[in-house]
């Protein structure tokens, strides 16, 4: 049987679901190929979305018309805004989700998407003709033909799970690996390598002594991830915290020779920022305890996730160690922790559009590009799906710059620097994080998305209304003066210096001790100005306050970004044979040849390419 589409997406994880939905919204006839339609966007590890920098990515996906934010809001069971004690540049939303409901909400979203079919099958052969990806063959003998193919296979390509000395092929617990698809990709010159990740035990809550743990409730100030979600009261479930102890550590150390990570059984690299419990013990031998977080998997299940105890130690060792923790003395588990090795592909062989440099019309997104995390996968999937659809129509690709989105930072890092370990996004990776806040993803991206065709008119109108209200509040604060006699008593109550002369409300908001809400309690006209008929009034006021309070920082960072744009506007791909440019350092020639950057800006970010190398290229381009 032959089925014909514009875009085929291989893999129904977080990257694949966003890619398929995005391509279909662009008008491309799309097919999502997945081995299990009942596990779409499965949360293979922790049942949570967001976190530091990751929450910003989810809001960006939403601002671009993607689905992850909507699905998260519909299935949240706890919410927290991380980094509240720091500046808004690094505020990051995080939600615990109901794992089962998350899958079915994604299924509902995809079922309602026009131009999208789902095919339950396994891709086994990539079809390439004349250097172009034109489809795939499946294990059921179906030929799927298309103009573009997006690979989002997660950890399933030659996946191998480890628990102690036991090794089981699989892409996830009790799910088969895809064993031959990698070879059909690498025969076209695409480089594959291996990475490793892991996950902890899943615990039966009925066996936990919660009286020996500390409750960690959510925040009452609930922010939705989606700009389209109406504010609501969130019934929240608590998480719980406890710690390992010396007995736990002694038990694990006594069996370290049975750990696949330390006996040579696993040779691939795991995520630096999500280490296994055995790695923590070996890396930090002086620490007497490590924190553990017990997270609910859903409202209607007894299954709980033990964050902080990822392990591939033998099953009995994991259980013996956990029973040394008072809260887990009678522990029962649903399954052990395990490590998994899998194939990924060198992301420096991709264009900034996530299209392969070697096979036209072939796109990659998610963990197959060497990243880790649902959010990083979803962001890549969104961009790969959009660009696959644009490719089908012969249009120029859609690429986000580093000052436009964390997604832009992510993809630029992957395609420019490559990876030697699973890549995780942090706010520290973004040099323009004051511009890339979680509150303004819609301001940065929704208009672009609407013009491109991936954001609806409803979403665009929603943003325009919000923009008008924010600008009105900022303008009012800039133009309205207050006199010392009208405000000084309140300023003293708020713990800030009284005024000697009249000033604008905006200059008062700029004080670190003051907020719009505080000032509104003392200035009746400001209280009236903050009132809107928008359901998300609190979000609008917060956005206006950030723009006022951090105006100088925002303007300064924007100027720096605009200077960098000059290098981004100088396209150098195809202009040089770098091997012949002896004015450039040997390492610089080698790296430039391998990456073959699109712009001078991208070239400047390649490790090993020096500023003097960039100056040489700049002089040559001016000639």
Model regions and ranges:
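Extended, charge-enriched "interface" segments that sit outside catalytic cores
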Residues: 429, 446-615, 619-623
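Conserved N-terminal/central alpha/beta ligand/cofactor-binding core
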Residues: 21-125, 129, 140, 152-172, ...
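Internal hydrophobic alpha-helix adjacent to the cofactor/substrate pocket in enzyme cavities
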Residues: 377-398
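An anion/pyrophosphate-binding glycine-rich loop and adjacent beta-alpha core
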Residues: 36-38, 54, 182-319, 411, ...
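Core beta-strand elements of the Rossmann-like FAD/NAD(P) dinucleotide-binding domain
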Residues: 3-5, 139-148
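A glycine-rich dinucleotide-binding beta-alpha-beta segment and adjacent secondary-structure elements
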Residues: 305-371, 398-412, 537-591, 596
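Short hydrophobic core segments
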Residues: 10, 143-154
């Amino acid at each position: 049987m032959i089925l014909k589409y514009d875009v085929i997406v291989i893999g129904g994880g977080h990257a694949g679901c966003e890619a398929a939905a995005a391509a279909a919204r662009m008008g491309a006839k799309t097919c999502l190929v997945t081995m299990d339609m009942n596990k779409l966007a499965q949360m293979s590890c922790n049942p949570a979305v967001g976190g530091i920098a990751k929450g910003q990515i989810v809001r960006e996906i939403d601002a671009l018309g993607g689905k992850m934010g909507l699905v998260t809001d519909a299935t949240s069971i706890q919410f927290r805004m991380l980094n509240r004690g720091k500046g808004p540049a690094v505020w990051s939303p995080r939600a615990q989700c109901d794992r089962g409901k998350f899958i079915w909400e994604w299924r509902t979203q995809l079922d309602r998407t026009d131009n999208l079919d789902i095919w339950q099958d396994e891709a086994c052969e990539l079809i390439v003709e004349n250097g172009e990806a034109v489809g795939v063959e499946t294990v059921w003998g179906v030929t799927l033909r298309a103009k573009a193919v997006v690979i989002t296979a997660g950890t399933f390509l030659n996946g191998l799970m480890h628990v102690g000395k036991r090794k089981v092929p699989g892409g996830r617990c009790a799910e088969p690996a895809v064993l031959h698809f990698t070879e059909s990709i690498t025969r076209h010159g695409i480089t594959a390598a291996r990475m490793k990740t892991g996950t902890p035990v899943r615990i039966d809550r009925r066996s936990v002594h919660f009286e020996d743990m500390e409750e960690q409730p959510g925040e009452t100030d609930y922010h939705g991830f989606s700009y389209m979600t109406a504010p609501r009261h969130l019934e929240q479930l608590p998480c719980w915290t406890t710690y390992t102890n010396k007995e736990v550590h002694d038990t694990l150390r006594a069996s370290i020779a049975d750990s696949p990570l330390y006996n040579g059984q696993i040779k691939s690299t795991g995520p630096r920022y999500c280490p296994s419990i055995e790695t923590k013990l070996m890396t930090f031998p002086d620490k007497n305890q490590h924190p553990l977080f017990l997270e609910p998997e859903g409202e209607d299940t007894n299954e709980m996730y033990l964050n902080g105890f990822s392990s591939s130690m033998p099953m009995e060792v994991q259980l013996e160690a956990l029973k040394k923790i008072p809260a887990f003395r009678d522990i029962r588990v649903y399954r052990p922790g395990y490590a998994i090795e899998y194939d990924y592909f060198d992301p420096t062989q991709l264009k900034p559009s996530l299209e392969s440099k070697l096979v036209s019309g072939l796109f990659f997104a998610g963990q197959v590009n060497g990243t880790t995390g649902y959010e990083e996968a979803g962001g890549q999937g969104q961009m790969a799906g959009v660009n696959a659809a644009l490719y089908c129509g012969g249009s120029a690709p859609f690429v986000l710059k580093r000052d436009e989105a964390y997604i832009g930072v992510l993809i630029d890092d992957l395609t420019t620097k490559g990876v030697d370990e699973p890549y995780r996004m942090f706010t520290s990776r973004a040099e323009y994080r004051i511009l890339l806040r979680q509150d303004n993803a819609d301001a940065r991206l929704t208009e672009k998305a609407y013009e491109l065709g991936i954001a609806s008119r409803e979403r665009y109108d929603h943003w325009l209304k919000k923009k008008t209200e924010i600008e009105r509040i900022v303008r009012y604060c800039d133009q309205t003066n207050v006199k010392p006699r009208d405000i000084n008593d309140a300023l003293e109550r708020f713990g800030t210096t009284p005024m000697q002369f009249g000033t604008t409300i905006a200059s008062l908001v700029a004080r670190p001790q003051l907020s719009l809400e505080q000032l509104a309690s003392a200035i009746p006209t400001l209280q009236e100005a903050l009132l809107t008929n928008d359901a998300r009034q609190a979000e609008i006021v917060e956005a206006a306050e950030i723009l006022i309070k951090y105006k100088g920082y925002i303007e300064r960072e924007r100027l720096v970004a605009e200077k960098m744009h000059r290098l981004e506007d100088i396209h150098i791909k195809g202009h040089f044979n770098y091997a012949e440019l002896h004015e450039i350092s040997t390492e610089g020639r080698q790296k430039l040849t391998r990456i073959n950057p699109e712009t001078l800006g991208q070239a400047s970010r390649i490790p090993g390419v020096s500023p003097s190398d960039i100056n040489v290229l700049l002089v040559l381009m001016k000639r």
